[in-house]
Regions:
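Short loop-beta-helix segment that forms the pyridoxal 5′-phosphate
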Residues: 158-164
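Conserved "HGTGT" condensation-loop signature of ketosynthase/thiolase-family condensing enzymes
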Residues: 2-158, 178-181
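Short, hydrophobic/aromatic alpha-helical segments in well-folded domains
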Residues: 172-176
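Short conserved active-site loop signatures built around small residues
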Residues: 169
Length: 183
């Protein structure tokens, strides 16, 4: 049986923002030379009466563009916007080289902008009405991050989000590689 080799697909420099910090070099340094202090935050915010450790980005984030609609205003998109500043020149170069219609946005996420609607859900759970607090369905959708990126960079090509919990990022890379190989 003859196996055909798939053409290679290369991953360029990633944009990275996490509890460890901002930028690839910061992450490499933190992983290779761990500090005495933990980047984890301890809180009972998520489970009442129990304290858990979790990672949180606590640095000041890049402000979202002033003209951005409410549908794109979420903490998730602001984290994304902050990270994308690291590779913004590469994104703009890809759009110039391949065109806005042939540039795709394939991403992985677990939350999209769902957190923005928690105040409404809590209000309703406490007996309030649905119309009493703001709700934006577009913030809540899984496609929210890819639609945001397409909007701010003027991308008109294929865009979607993979959401498989812990493997979302890896699955998004696999999907993107398949798209590149398909032409």
């Amino acid at each position: 049986r003859r196996t055909m080799m798939k053409p290679p697909v290369y991953l360029s420099r990633p944009a990275v923002t996490s509890a460890l910090g901002n930028g690839l070099r910061t992450h490499i340094d933190a992983l290779l030379m761990p500090s005495e202090t933990s980047p984890l935050t301890f809180s009972d915010q998520w489970v009442k009466g129990k304290t858990f450790a979790f990672g949180a980005v606590n640095e000041t984030l890049r402000p979202l563009p002033d003209n951005l609609s409410a549908a794109h205003r979420s903490r998730n998109n602001q984290l994304l916007w902050h990270a994308l500043e690291q590779i913004e020149d590469d994104i703009r170069a890809a759009v110039r080289r391949y065109g806005a219609a042939r540039t795709a946005v394939i991403m992985g996420t677990s939350t999209s902008g769902a957190d923005e609607n928690i105040p409404l859900f809590q209000h309703v759970a406490d007996g309030g009405g649905w119309a009493d607090k703001p709700f934006n369905q577009l913030q809540h959708e899984m496609a929210s991050p890819s639609e945001f990126v397409a909007h701010v960079y003027g991308i008109h090509g294929l865009r979607y989000v993979v959401s498989t919990a812990c493997t979302s990022g890896a699955r998004a890379l696999i999907s993107a590689a398949r798209l590149l190989r398909s032409g």
